Each structure stands twice: as structure tokens, then as C-alpha cells.
Swiss-Prot record:
A motif ('HIGH' region) lies at residues 50-60. GO terms for biological process: leucyl-tRNA aminoacylation. Its EC number is 6.1.1.4. This is Leucine--tRNA ligase. Keywords: Aminoacyl-tRNA synthetase, ATP-binding, Cytoplasm, Ligase, Nucleotide-binding, Protein biosynthesis. Belongs to the class-I aminoacyl-tRNA synthetase family. It is an enzyme of class 6 (ligase). The keyword Transmembrane does not apply. It is found in: Cytoplasm. It comes from the Bacteria. One of its GO terms (cellular component) is cytosol. GO terms for molecular function: aminoacyl-tRNA deacylase activity; ATP binding; leucine-tRNA ligase activity.
Amino acid sequence: MTTESMPESTNDYQPQSIEAAIQHVWDEQQVFVAKEDDSKEKFYCLSMFPYPSGKLHMGHVRNYTIGDVVSRFQRMQGKNVLQPMGWDAFGLPAENAAMDNQVAPAKWTYQNIDYMRNQLKRLGLGYDWTREVATCHPEYYRWEQWLFTRLMEKGLVYRKLSVVNWDPVDQTVLANEQVIDGKGWRSGVPVERKEIAQWFLRITDYAEELLTDLDQLEGWPEQVKTMQKNWIGKSTGLEIEFPIASGLDESNGSLKVYTTRPDTLMGVTYVAVAADHPWARKASVNNEPLERFIEECSHISTAEADMETMEKKGVDTGIRVKHPITGDEVPVWAANFVLMGYGTGAVMSVPAHDQRDYEFAKAYDLPIKAVIAPKAGEEADVSEAAFTEKGVLVNSGQFDGLKSKQALHEMAKVLGELGLGEKQTNYRLRDWGISRQRYWGCPIPVIYCPACGALPVPEKDLPVRLPEDVVPDGSGSPLAKLDSFKKCECPQCGGPANRETDTFDTFFESSWYHARYTSRHEDNAMLDKAAADHWLPVDQYIGGIEHAILHLLYARFFHKLMRDEGLVSSDEPFKNLLTQGMVLAGSWFTQDEKGKQTWYSPLDVDPVTDDKGAIVKGTLKSDGTEVQYGGIIKMSKSKNNGIDPQTLIDQYGADTLRLYIMFASPPEQTLEWSDSAVEGAHRFLNRVWRQVQTHVSTGVVAACTSNDDLTKEQKALRLKLHTTLQKVTDDMGRRMHFNTAIAATMELLNDISRFKDESDAGRSVMQEALEMLVLMLSPMTPHASQALWEALGHDGLVLNVTWPTVDDAALVKDEIEIMVQVNGKLRGKIEVAAEADKDTILAAAKANEQAAKFIDGKDIVKEIVVPGRLVNIVVKG
């Protein structure tokens, strides 16, 4: 460094003054501003950017501390590091806060950004703030609008009717999570399913590439790749047609279904269609029960999770179709578990071999016909549940005896000859619906002209700016009611036209921010290709496992869209992925007679434990009221068990919080909060501080660089030091197990504390040990490490110091410990010179006081020496 603003070194560790001074120096010298530099290996470290909700929580702190530690470590490896930060600023919470507080979402968002930016700086996070983005800024979202218009021209965007959750009171579309027990979360009235026109991106055009390119991602957790594979859901099966038998005119064609289990075709006893399937609607005319059922289904959530758990219901439509092979009539039922938006909106139902079909058949007394047996000559037991495994076909006529796998080919052949079926590869993945009937989002750049139709907004007119002074009232779309936004001129014919009043799904913004960071100041293009290609792909991406599917899949998709637009050269956005675990804490509540729960902060409760130390209950510190223990659960506002990071920074300093976060658990595992462990981290930093201050109080010396002329004790400390350095380097660089790296430094400090040698050589060894300890801790505790680095006599920034290298000579032991066994049992230990020969080792073993008790007066039958490890003396008598 040095700087006048640094506080003078003191024997007392005073984190607040130290941290403020050092952060000032970082800002003043712009040490984290990254520039393209081909002379160094680049390292782009990115943590998922936050939604500016108002305050950082411990989940944020963990995510961002991990990223900062990785960045600082890689910088000390000599790499050119980029670590940016920004804000995922659009979204529903801002609208809700606006309605609650009568303030424009823009104002609320920008205030939160300012506050949270300061919190991030207080944590000592080394971000390049010159690259900061906020997705609600027009200079950011103009480029996603531009990309949308390019995709529109390429045919990768289309508009179609789609079913949504509609709140009839608020006159607005609800996200699935806003539907509570079938009712709107604000209005409390039953929601309706409604078809409205929405925009979609053809992500299915990239389904195969998104699937196969997962194999490139060797630095991703297998769990995440498996989740994405399952979400994409590639399958091979048959599309089968069931011709109309009765109940509808034959002009309606056949009912098409897709199945991955054609081996069960001969066990079909009914076909189920979605309640809003065209056939069901036609059949509902003059069919009151069916009409009522369709109306009932229009009020249930479209969320897949809800569909899985709800009671399965249905009504016979009266329509009959012909089994494609037997010609038997099969009833068509309208069922609430079939969605029109998935596949053909119809499924063939085989109760004997599908549990959902089985339960439905039992409920409505439909036939159950087993056509798969576990093995030839056996029968499947379907008396209590469906047999869902594959096996051998039975009761299947010409297909009897075939194995399930063989049946796919045989069924395809027969159905192909009949013109009623063909092999098909399907994907579970659906095109991405990107329209949101929200105000606080990026406007979709489309103009509707009565004469010319839907047109992209011309590039010269971008961005389509979102008015920032609107305060939503929760009813309808604010933009649709705002003529100053909605009314416009057709870019093609010049006539009166209307703007699209929907906004993009907020996943749109977070799908390309990683790329925009590389070109933050590029005003004339979405990306500066040279800069993007310099930094991309991201070398280390860090975020929660909850983003394993949607965000990470959409970001991969967007990266490929940008590649195909010539904006980037890489196929994938993120080379390595670390998914950090959640932060957990104890929880406490009371419950009234109506079952309503009130949650209390752990800071306000005194736990009561049983004789084994297990928590059984608690009492409020304020008045002694008894409270129930809710267990260790995720920190959350709703459970009132979060810990405010700011409080801990004020009390202990940022370095203590950072050190605790990195030490408490491996990054990919959950972290269980412990106040006492935070205090322990603070005590450790104080010990390091005092150790350095004690050493430098009599002056600094040159650090030791070799084992020449050192005593046994001095060599032992150097051995411990370089063994620790070897472990810490591997733990932090390759394994990313920061907790074990920190544990190793704690062990090292214990050895340093025990080393009492004020000779010149001893002080030189101590200087080396303390310097390396400070360097090893510096990624976790950058402020204290900077101050201690200066105290040890160094100028400049510790984060620019090259990571120390292991002295292999220090790892060589002059003496080694040998186990002494007698008749295979451990009887003693000896220390001998590392180069001692067999005779010397045996002599020392026999002279060992403990071992001699079992050897003296007995005949030695055999002597075994395993070099460097043990001696075994076999005796008898």
C-alpha cells in the first residue's frame, strides 16, 4: 500500500478502522478494475447477481464470499481476474412493494441498489464496479430488445394462445406461486384458466444441443446435469392414432397420443384428454356433468407440482375410439391430470402398468388389464397397485412373449403398416413462454398495426423505454392503460398502431448478463466480440442449486443464440459451476388455539436442553414465555430466523464473518449457523494479530528461505509450514474445500505459538511462517492480512503478491518416526535419521525401553524392517 489513511499498527485488533481504511485504498487505486490483457491467463469469476430486495441476507453473503475468495486466490496465482457485480432488478416484488408503500417500483429499486451496493463494499468484496449493470436500465435492456427483434426475423419467436392463471377481480395474470389453494393471493377469489396470446422462444429447436453439450461441462456437478437432462426429457416412443368409433363425427380425425411404453398398448382400457381439449368441449354440448367438470378445471392451477398432488378426477365424454390394433371400442374420459399444453393433450391409459392410471381406474370402476409380466410364465400382481416395471408381454395376442424393448420395434412396424403409428423422438422441454402481464419488466419490442400485423420495433427506435413513474394498483396491466406508452405509429405504413404491453419474463435479463459484463461500456452493440471472446466462457460460476434448471438452462440457450448471432464464439457460458448450500439456523414459534404461528428471532430466545444437550423448547428473553423449537431450517424472513450480516460486520468486522462463512462447512453443503463459531473465528483472527504484533515488536527480519544450518526445532516448523502450504494450495485451488484449508492454518498457528526461539535463525523462521500464514489467509481475510503484511515490513497490496511456493527441501525430514512392533503388536516408537540403515534401525528398536520389555530374555525368531514405517521383531519363549 502504503497510505496515510491506514491506522497505526496496534496490539489490539480493531477491524472497523482497519477495514474502512483498506477499502478506501482499494477504491482509490481501482485495484479491482479488470482490463483485457493477453499476457496473462484470464480468470472470470461470477456469482449469481442478486435481486435488490433491500438488504443482503446470509445466503448472499455466503455466495459472494465464496466468489471473492476464489477470485483473490486466482489473482495471487498470477491470473488476470474479472469479478463483476450487478442487479437482477426487474420483477414482481418491486410491484408489490410499490402497491404497499405507494412508491414507484423504479424509486424503490434504485434505493435498494444503493443500500445493498454499500453492504457489498463493507464485506470487502473485490468487484469491478465500473462494469456494474442493473437490468432495469434502458442501456441494458435495449440490447435484449434488439436480440428479440433479430430472433423474430429468424423465426425463433412466435405468438400463440396459451393457458394462464387469471384473477377475475384484479384482471391480471398470476404466476403459479401466486395461486394459493386455487385462489388469487391478493384478491382471495378463485382463479380461472384463461387463454391469452403470448410470445414464445423456440428453445425446443436447441433441445438436442442443450442435451448433448452437457457432456462438455466436466466442471459441473453431476446432480445439476442430471436435473437438466430430466427437464429436457428426451425420449423415444411411438405416436399412436386412435380412430373415432362413436360420439363424434369422423371428420374430427383420430385422437393422437405419444407413449414411451408401446409395450403396454394392448392394456389400454381408456384414453384421457385434457378438460379443455377440443373433443371434450364438443362433447360437453348437452352434457351437463362434463360441462360442469370443464368449468371446475378452469379454476385449478396449471402448476405441474400442483397437478401431481391434487386428487385425480374425470368425466366420461361419451366419445369412443377404436383400439388401433384390436379395433375394440375404448372410452374417452376428460381428466384433470392431463394438460392441453403438454404433447397432444391426450394420453393412452394403462391402469395395470401406470400408478396414476390405476388410481383413476379404481376410482371410476374402469377395467384393469395386465399385459406385462415380470418374466415369462409369471403374472403381474395388480391387485393392490400397478406393475410399472418392464418385462415380457402377455395377453397381447401376436406380441406375446416379446420383451418390452423388442415391442417398440414390433409395434412400430405393425402400426406403420396400418397407418396408425410411427416412431417419434420427443422432448419434455416446452418452448419458453416469455410474455408477462406485468409492469416492472422489459417492454417487448413489438408493434401491432391493424393493416400490417405484428412488427418488430425498428433498431433505430430502440430501446422501447419503460415509464418509470408508474405506481401499479394491482388491477390489470398498467402499460395497457397508459396511452402515452401504448399508442404509437406503425413503422411500416405510418398508420395508428399499438405497442405490446406485456413485458419479458425476468429470466430473459438474467440469461445474458454474464456476457454484458465483458462489454459494459459498448454503446453500439450488444457485445464487443473481442472483449466477449477474451473473457468468455465464465471460468467459475457460483450460485444456489435452486437455479439448476430454469436460469442455468435459459442462460445456456441464450449463449447459443448469441453465438449463432455472431456475438460470442464459445458454445457454453459457464465452464465450472459451484452450487453452494443453504444457510440454516434454529427456529422458534408459538401457536395459538386457531393454529396460527408466530415466529421469533433466535436472538430473542434462551434455549432449554435436556440432559443429553438436545434442545426441547425455549423461553423468550423478554418475558419468559415458553416457545416451541422448530428445528434447524433455512434462514428466511417468514420464519424470522435470519441473522443480519450488517450487525455482525459492526460487531466483529467483515473478515470475521468471511472467515466463519468459509470455515463452517464445505461450500456445496448446507451451513448451520453458530454464534459461538463466529466468536471462535474472531478469536482466531485476534490470535494471528497478536502473534504478528509480538514478533514485529522487536523488529522485522528477512524471512528464512532454506534449511541450511537450522536446528531440529527450526526445521520442524518449516516442515509444518510447507506441508500446510501444500495442503492449503490444493484445498483452495483444486478441491475448493476452503474449510479444510482454514483448519490447516489453525493447526499451523498452534505450532507457531509453541515455537519459542529468539535467535537470529529462529526469528527468520518465524518471519517466514507468519508471512506465509498471512498470505494463505488473505483471500478469506483480506483486510487483516493487508494490515499484517505491512506490519511484517512489506509495501504494496497483499492481493498483488504472488502465492507462495512450497520449498521441497523443507518437506524432507532429517529424522523419521518408526513404529516398533513385537509379534505384530505396537510396543513403542523410535526416531532415527532418515538415511539410517537396517542395522541402525534394528539397534534403536531393541534399545527402545517399551519394546525391550517384550524382547529381553526371549529368542528372536525373525526381524522385519519396512523402510520409513515400522520394525517387527518376532520372538518366542
